[in-house]
């Protein structure tokens, strides 16, 4: 077993061990272990590529890190306008609680959209690295994920100072927020790995992704609550695995609800609608876990064909 030093264009020297570790490992568990081992071994490269992505994003930008909150603000303002228009039609005013929910869900949705949009093309836009230098290709979409996480952290920090003005106070159910954000991170990671891999083999994937992200906000409860869609409509909306996460954020942070307890309400039309059920959280967690495992395996087992398709 020998070690071979290689250098990549990000400026990080890495070492690849040639020998038994390079032999294909049978089984899903073995493949996952190999993926994690490679990511740990190349963690410095992952961090360097993340720093590169952040630097490129803000280099010579007049607004600087202000761009990190521009997209969330744009989404939130759009949500405010939509809810205001809906309130004018229904005759029910929009309260601070609704605005707080839109702001919180808008930042979370912006993280998903920004990451997927940027990460889908990471393999094709880094063709020089993919075709010439050995490293686990997973670090390319994951570096985009971490760079967007940096941006979202800035947005969430700003939101922390805004929410108290919208009536959100300190309470124990705020502890649900980190768990829900972690689930969103996992689902986003699964999407970035799968879509970046798919886009390498089918270049029109990036256009399909842009269309889905553009119209996806209308099928995701960012500007509205699922209960507004009625008993059947709310169930359909919550089939989107991101929907229970966004609603969980609103229910726990804004409404101070314990997500373990189911909650039902009666609509203006007299229909009883389930506003929250912990099964939704279980559903999202299952999709996040299985989706990440599946996308990681697909990505890993397709790597051998990356260089010839880049």
Language-model segments: which ranges?
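Hydrophobic transmembrane alpha-helices and immediately adjacent juxtamembrane helices
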Residues: 1-310
């Amino acid at each position: 077993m020998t070690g071979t030093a290689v250098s990549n264009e990000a400026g990080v020297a890495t070492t690849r061990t040639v020998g038994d570790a390079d032999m294909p490992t049978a089984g899903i568990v073995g493949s996952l272990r190999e993926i994690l081992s490679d990511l740990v071994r190349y963690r410095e490269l992952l961090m360097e590529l993340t720093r590169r992505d952040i630097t490129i994003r803000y280099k010579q930008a007049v607004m600087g890190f202000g761009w990190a909150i521009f997209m969330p603000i744009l989404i939130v303002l759009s949500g405010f306008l939509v809810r205001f228009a809906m309130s004018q039609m229904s005759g029910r005013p929009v309260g601070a609680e609704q605005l707080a929910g839109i702001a919180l869900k808008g930042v979370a949705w912006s993280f998903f959209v920004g990451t997927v949009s940027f990460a889908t093309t990471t393999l094709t836009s880094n063709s020089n690295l993919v075709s010439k230098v050995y490293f686990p290709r997973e670090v390319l979409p994951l570096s985009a994920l971490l760079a967007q996480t940096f941006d979202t952290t800035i947005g969430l920090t700003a939101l922390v100072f805004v929410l108290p003005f919208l009536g959100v106070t300190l309470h124990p159910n705020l502890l649900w927020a980190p768990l829900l954000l972690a689930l969103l991170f996992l689902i986003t990671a699964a999407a970035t790995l799968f879509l970046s891999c798919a886009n390498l083999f089918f270049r029109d994937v990036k256009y399909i992704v842009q269309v889905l992200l553009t119209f996806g906000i209308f099928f995701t409860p960012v500007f509205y609550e699922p209960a507004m869609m009625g008993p059947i409509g709310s169930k359909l909306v919550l089939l989107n695995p991101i929907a229970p996460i966004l609603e969980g954020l609103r229910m726990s942070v804004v409404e101070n609800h314990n997500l373990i307890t189911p909650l039902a309400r009666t609509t203006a039309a007299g229909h009883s609608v389930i506003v929250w059920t912990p099964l939704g959280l279980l559903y999202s967690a299952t999709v996040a876990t299985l989706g990440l495992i599946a996308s990681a395996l697909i990505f890993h087992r397709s790597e051998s064909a990356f260089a010839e398709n880049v």
